[in-house]
């Protein structure tokens, strides 16, 4: 039996306060069904970060995986861009 293609999202880390868990906001744009205007949507996902390497503000790529907890169904694949600390 062949495994399904897993979803991969890119987003920004908004929280890294939990141990081995990050919260990532993924923003998408869609057209309104009636008026056709482009609307921004955002959704938060909790992702597993084994080494606690991602920090708040980083741009990361996450991949769908088996359920790791009640809310956690994604894991960190890579850190695309690190946040600039001022």
Curated annotation (Swiss-Prot):
PROSITE patterns to which the protein is assigned, alphabetical: RIBOSOMAL_S17
Gene3D superfamilies associated with the record: Nucleic acid-binding proteins
Superkingdom classification of source: Bacteria
UniProt cross-references to InterPro entries, sorted A to Z: NA-bd_OB-fold (IPR012340), Ribosomal_uS17 (IPR000266), Ribosomal_uS17_bact/chlr (IPR019984), Ribosomal_uS17_CS (IPR019979)
GO molecular function, a single term: structural constituent of ribosome
Keyword presence, Ribosomal protein: yes
Keywords tagged on the record: Ribonucleoprotein, Ribosomal protein, RNA-binding, rRNA-binding
GO BP: translation
GO cellular component terms listed in the entry, alphabetical order: cytosolic small ribosomal subunit
SUBUNIT field: Part of the 30S ribosomal subunit.
Homology family: Belongs to the universal ribosomal protein uS17 family.
Function: One of the primary rRNA binding proteins, it binds specifically to the 5'-end of 16S ribosomal RNA.
UniProt-listed PANTHER family: 40S RIBOSOMAL PROTEIN S11 FAMILY MEMBER (PTHR10744), SMALL RIBOSOMAL SUBUNIT PROTEIN US17M (PTHR10744:SF1)
Protein name per its UniProtKB record: Small ribosomal subunit protein uS17
Organism from which the protein derives: Lactococcus lactis subsp. cremoris (strain MG1363)
